Amino acid sequence: MADRLTQLQTCVDQMLTQYFSALTHINTNHGFKSLAGEELVKDDTVPVVTDEERERTLEELAKDLVVKSQQIDYLIDSLPGIGSSEEHQMQQIEKLQKELEHYDQVTEDVIKEKDELLEHCDELILKLAQRKAHIDVESM
């Protein structure tokens, strides 16, 4: 799962796409009106859409934009640090830094212990090999 900032950026990108799609739809599916005293101009490349259908589509596009806005608001509200002071955030960072240093030390200690155990295993294997070689020499 993506982090909140990535989700927020994705939602903003999606909302911009929705805005563009809505504007494109409005631009291509608008109704023609005649100006005072002039005859109605028509464009054969523009599909004929009833007023009812146009309104229903515009309402659906508007609802989609509202839902996306709510998602963005939710993500913004869920960002860490919202509602806490800068001092509190700095204290939290210091606490996490100390925790990280502690776990770095634990990791370092475990690696050191692993190296010591490997060295001990090497010594034991070497002793066993020497004893086996000594036994093989005596049995000849």
Swiss-Prot record:
List localization entries: Nucleus
Could you name the Gene Ontology cellular component terms for this entry?
core mediator complex; mediator complex
Q: Could you tell me the keywords of this UniProt record?
A: Activator, Coiled coil, Nucleus, Transcription, Transcription regulation
Q: Which GO terms describe its molecular function?
A: RNA polymerase II-specific DNA-binding transcription factor binding; transcription coactivator activity; transcription coregulator activity; transcription corepressor activity
Q: Name the GO terms of the biological process aspect.
A: negative regulation of transcription by RNA polymerase II; positive regulation of transcription elongation by RNA polymerase II; positive regulation of transcription initiation by RNA polymerase II; regulation of transcription by RNA polymerase II; RNA polymerase II preinitiation complex assembly
InterPro entries for the chain:
Med7/Med21-like (IPR037212), Mediator_Med21 (IPR021384)
Task: Please indicate which superkingdom the organism of origin belongs to.
Answer: Eukaryota
Which residues lie in coiled coils?
Answer: 52-130
One family from Pfam that matches here is Med21
According to its UniProt record, which protein family does this protein belong to? Belongs to the Mediator complex subunit 21 family.
Q: What does this protein do?
A: Component of the Mediator complex, a coactivator involved in the regulated transcription of nearly all RNA polymerase II-dependent genes. Mediator functions as a bridge to convey information from gene-specific regulatory proteins to the basal RNA polymerase II transcription machinery. Mediator is recruited to promoters by direct interactions with regulatory proteins and serves as a scaffold for the assembly of a functional preinitiation complex with RNA polymerase II and the general transcription factors.
What quaternary arrangement does the UniProt entry report?
Answer: Component of the Mediator complex.
Q: What is this protein called?
A: Mediator of RNA polymerase II transcription subunit 21
UniProt lineage: Eukaryota, Fungi, Dikarya, Ascomycota, Saccharomycotina
